[in-house]
């Protein structure tokens, strides 16, 4: 029987929540509506992986830039972090995976969720690293959702194989959306029109983004995540694939993401 999500640090009656496992954000909201999607009834996605929330994908994303790394999406989300908690609600987790030190800082306030990731190369040779927040953003209806702020960036939809660059500034969340975006700007917004709001995702040091939703045009939803496709859109930010970073020995890669909500 799964013990995930394990030890939790909570505030505001559980509407703000971080798990020690993966130093993974599970909940945050600024008003009466949740901003993060987390399936507490089916918390174990697979062995040692929490379903939903904001999984931390590091020191590689997917199977790495050369498609030769396992497990998928790195070791961070499968690792129990050493965590300290401060007030106001601030969680700092540290871990060591594959000679890469990981420090993840989470700060929650009434107006924003802020995260900062630092990856340190403890190896004696340069390392290619990736880091992404695989953020599950809660929406009223993903079929009506759009992501704004993509104009000029390049894209590759790994569900369809299509690729190109954005002329328009918005991406609709259609079936078969698994779109890696490179050269994206520092300000994205998820338009959650059914709930009359937009969720801002502002970043530093994050040239990559991924927009993903499990709705498929051809296959049946056969797991709890796919069955809940209408309830979330993943807007993932960080550095991955073509923007993987070579980190010198004893050097760092640092990036940050800030999430906030505004009425449409």
Which residues are covered by each model-predicted region?
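Beta-strand secondary-structure signal
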Residues: 17, 82, 90-92, 103-105, ...
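Acidic, contiguous internal or C-terminal segments within carbohydrate-active enzymes
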Residues: 95-135, 139
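Beta-strand-rich interaction surfaces with strong enrichment in secreted/lumenal proteins
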Residues: 45-46, 103-106, 242-247
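Beta-strand-rich N-terminal accessory domains
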Residues: 1-51, 186-206, 249-264
């Amino acid at each position: 029987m799964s013990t995930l999500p394990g030890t939790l640090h909570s505030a505001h009656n559980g509407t703000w929540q971080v798990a020690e496992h993966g130093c993974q954000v599970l909940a945050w909201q600024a008003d009466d509506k949740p901003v993060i999607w987390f399936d507490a009834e089916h918390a174990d996605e697979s062995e040692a992986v929490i379903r939903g929330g904001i999984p931390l994908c590091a020191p590689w994303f997917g199977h790495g830039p050369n498609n030769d790394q396992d497990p998928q999406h790195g070791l961070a989300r499968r690792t129990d972090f050493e965590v300290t908690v401060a007030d106001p609600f601030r969680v700092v987790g540290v871990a060591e995976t594959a000679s890469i030190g990981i420090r993840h800082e989470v700060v929650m306030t009434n107006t924003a969720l802020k995260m900062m990731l630092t990856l340190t190369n403890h190896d004696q040779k340069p390392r290619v690293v990736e880091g992404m927040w695989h953020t599950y953003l809660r929406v009223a209806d993903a079929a009506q959702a759009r992501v704004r702020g993509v104009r000029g960036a390049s894209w590759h939809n790994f569900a369809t194989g299509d690729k190109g660059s954005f002329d328009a500034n918005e991406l609709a969340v259609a079936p078969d959306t698994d779109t890696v975006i490179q050269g994206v700007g520092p300000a994205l917004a998820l338009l959650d029109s059914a709930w009359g709001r937009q969720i801002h995702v502002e970043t530093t040091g994050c040239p990559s983004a991924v927009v993903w939703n499990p709705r498929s045009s051809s296959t049946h939803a056969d797991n709890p995540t796919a069955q809940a496709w209408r309830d979330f859109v993943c807007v993932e930010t960080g550095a991955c694939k073509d923007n993987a970073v070579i980190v010198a020995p004893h050097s760092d890669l640092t990036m940050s993401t800030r999430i906030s909500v505004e009425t449409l």
